[in-house]
Amino acid sequence: MKTNIQQYFLILLILFFSINVYSQDSDDIINKVKEKQKLLSDYKADIKIKVNIDFLKVPDVDAKIYYKKPDKFKIVSDGFLMLPKEGFNVSPESFFKEDITSVFVKKEKLNSFQTNVIKIIPNYDQSDLVLSTLWIDDKEFVIRKVESTFKQGGTVVLDFDYDNKYLTYGLPSKLKFTFDLKNMRLPKNFSGFDTPGKKKSDKSPSTTGEIYIIYTNYEINKGINDKIFQDK
């Protein structure tokens, strides 16, 4: 009997220390991502937005993106921007600005990159976010992928590509944004399949949409006037 109690105690002790080690791992990894972000005060860049939705024909849009620490973020374009609200703000500090609990899950190969998989849970009920899973590069400590579930907006997935030139700041060269169409309100003038002479596809339209954003001409830490972020 005494031996069994000792065995149970040993198992509990191992579990306790394992949980603490994993918790410490997740905090350390996130702090390394934040350290990289401390190098960045502001940036602006040109972006090209490509929308891929089965039943919509949306032209590519050129725009400018602005970010200023700690949380100023804006996209400016003369064209029509169809961007889902939930999860779209990918400013460097947006993933860690809330009061969160983080848990290290595992190490995983993502494409050709070794990553740390970390789950993030907000610590208050008012948050629209339910859960985020982050794939963080084990060498460069940049975010390679994020999958987030929201209370009202379903699930969104962000996939990041980086050029070596801007890797120091954790700024992407390309972003793929995948989202649930059923949770997105579409403009009335987009009725779908309304191109003259175009035959309707027999296939059921996809339930997900994709937005690709290509970043060029970064200007980093040059200073940005706060007036840029004011609504006109």
Model-derived features with residue positions:
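Extended lipid/amphipathic-ligand handling interfaces
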Residues: 32, 63-68, 158-166
